[in-house]
C-alpha cells in the first residue's frame, strides 16, 4: 500500500497547536572567525580567540585583553557608503545576516516581504561611536558631529540596517536585555512565527562595544579578568582560578522558518527550535540571585515549553562567563532543574574561547547549539584545570566530545536579572 503525500507530510504543529519552527540557516562573525563554519571549527578544536586588546587604548585599565573579530572588513559585504554610515555592531549584524540568508538558500525576491521579520538582541549600541562623539563635542563642539552620529549609535539600528539591506518588511523588534539579549532575539522571533505573524524570521544578537567606556565601566565593577599574561588562558569558566569575564564582540544570526514554509520551498533543515523560557531574578542590578532561582525558572520553563523532561536534555550550552559568582550560581541552578540528572548531562561554555560579547553572546551560542546537533559534537570548556568544589558537574573539559546530540538547552543570564533559555532539537520530520 502506497502512502499519499498528504499522509507522509510531517506534523506541522506542536503539542500546543502552534506552528513548528525550524532553523534553516546560520551566520556568524566572531573572534574565532568571520563565518559560521570557521567559528564552529575553532570551537571544536578548542582554540582561543582572545588576545591583546587593539580596538581601544588600555593604558589606564587593568584589563588589556579581549575577544576581537580578526581582520574584519565591512566592505567585504557592504559598499563604502553603507559601511561609513553604520556603527560596527550594525556592520557585523548585516554581514552575519547576509551569510545566514545565503546559508538558508532563501530567494528573498520570491517571498512576501511583509511575512519576513527580524528580532535582534543588543546590549550597548554604538559604544565606540558614543565615545568618539563625546571627544568631538569636547574638542570641537557639538555642531561638528556627523549627521549620522545619532542614528548610528541607537541599539535598534542593527535591526534596522539588516531589515533595510534584506528588505524585511514584517515584524521587527530589538531586545536590549543585556547579556540575555541574543538568546531573547531568537526566542522572541520563535514566538512571532508561533503566533502566525511571520513565515521567516532573522534572529540572534550582535555586539561591538569594546571601548574605553565599556572597559572603564566594567573595570570599576571588578567584573573583568586581569589575567593579561596569557590571554588565551584568561577565560576559564567553572575553573577555581577564574577571575572575571573577558570582553568580546561578535554576532550570531539564525534564520527561523515556519516548518510548513521550509518544506514547501525544499529547504535544508538544520534543527528545530522547540522551547523558550524567560524569567527575572527581581534581585539586584548586576548580581544573580544567590540560589539561582531565576535562572532555574527560565531553564525549567524552556524545557516544559518543549514538552520535555530535564533528563531528556543531552547537552547544556552554559552562560558560563568565567566570573566567580555566575558560574557557581549557574551550577546550582542546573542542579535545581535537573536533580540527579545534573551529574549526567554534558555542559560547556562557548565563552571559554571567545569571551563575553554581552548582547551578541546568545546569538553566537545559538549558532554553536545548532552546529552541535548538526555535527554530533560538543565543544569543550577550555582552560578547565583546577576543579572548584562549587562547580562539580561535567563541563566537557578541554577536549571536544563526539556523540549524537538530539536535545540541547542554551542558557543566557543578563545584568538586571534577565534570564533566557532555548531548547533546540534534532529535526525528525
Question: Model-found features: residue ranges?
Answer:
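Active-site-proximal alpha-helical scaffold in enzymes
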Residues: 93-107, 155-158, 163-207, 245-267, ...
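Active-site-adjacent elements of ketosynthase-type condensing enzymes
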Residues: 2, 58, 62-68, 125-129, ...
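Conserved beta-ketoacyl condensing-enzyme motif
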Residues: 23, 38-39, 44-177, 206-217, ...
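Flexible, low-complexity linker/loop segments at domain and module junctions
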Residues: 2-23, 110-113, 306-312, 343, ...
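A glycine- and small-aliphatic-rich helix-loop capping segment at beta-alpha/alpha-beta transitions
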Residues: 37-44, 127-142, 192-195, 215-228, ...
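Glycine-/small-residue-rich "gating" segment that lines the acyl/pantetheine channel
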Residues: 139-146, 184-187, 191, 200, ...
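ACP-dependent fatty acid/polyketide chain-elongation machinery
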Residues: 2-82, 104, 260-270, 367-382, ...
